Amino acid sequence: MLQEEADTVLFSGDLTTTSLDSEFREVADAFSPLYEKWGDNLIVIPGNHDRYTPKSVKAKLYEKYFPRAFAGSGDRVFSKTLSDDVCVIGFDSSKPFMLRSNGDFTLELKEEIDAEFEKSKQLHKHIILMGHFPYSYPSDVPSKFHHKLLGEESLAELISRHNPIAYLHGHKHVRWCLRDAVTPETLCINAGPSGMSSSDPDKHAGWMIFDVTESGNIDQLIKVHLSKDGEPVRETVDLN
């Protein structure tokens, strides 16, 4: 990833597997070169695996090892300017469920995001929203109760009103992009896993790259996965 010449790097969570101190320490070391290159333009939010146990949340392990991430301030919602016309709004809907992998999109969280949209719209023409959990799935990837965002319909309703140009997320460890019928103006992008191994390129370690045009369109969406030799393999996604 250090080879990429991106303006901004967005990471939508699941830095760890079970939110152990040793895992956070290892990941923080791995992210150090990325922070050296991108600084505050490397934007990280936690996933459910980073809030996996009540003990890790109480100890604030995520905040300890990623103090530059937005949740280090104690907030669950943030916004950051990416250019004169574009900003990103991120939110943290992860909490420890122990035997389940749900997120929780509460009314309070929805109200905070609503307020952040209203504020950001005064300053920027185009907004990208980033959370950890999807609210829409491809037909071949079923949504399961024990793994879904509780309140995903409420998130979809919020997005249908504010029409961000994209919703970036993760959680399901497979790369995809789609437009949901409820939110046709918003492109949902799942960057997939950054560190897994699979014979399926969309489930293998990689990321997604895209540009935002002056008119706010998502342009040049590219899937990237790593070859056996660790070299990036690129595939342009047809958005038509």
What are these regions (language model features)?
Residues 5-6, 39, 122-126, 164, ...:
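A general structural motif
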Residues 144-215:
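Conserved beta-sheet core of the metallophosphoesterase superfamily
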Residues 25-115, 154-160, 182-188, 206-210:
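Extended active-site neighborhood of metal-dependent phosphoesterases/phosphodiesterases
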Residues 17-20, 44-56, 96-100, 133-139, ...:
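Active-site environment of divalent metal-dependent phosphoester hydrolases
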Residues 8-14, 41-48, 92, 128-131, ...:
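Active-site neighborhood of phospho(di)ester-bond hydrolases with catalytic His/Asp-centered motifs
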Residues 101-104, 120-165, 172:
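Active-site-proximal segments of metal-dependent phosphoesterases and phosphodiesterases across multiple
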Residues 1-25, 240:
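N-terminal active-site segment of His-dependent metallophosphoesterases
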Residues 212-240:
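A short C-terminal boundary segment appended to hydrolase-like catalytic domains
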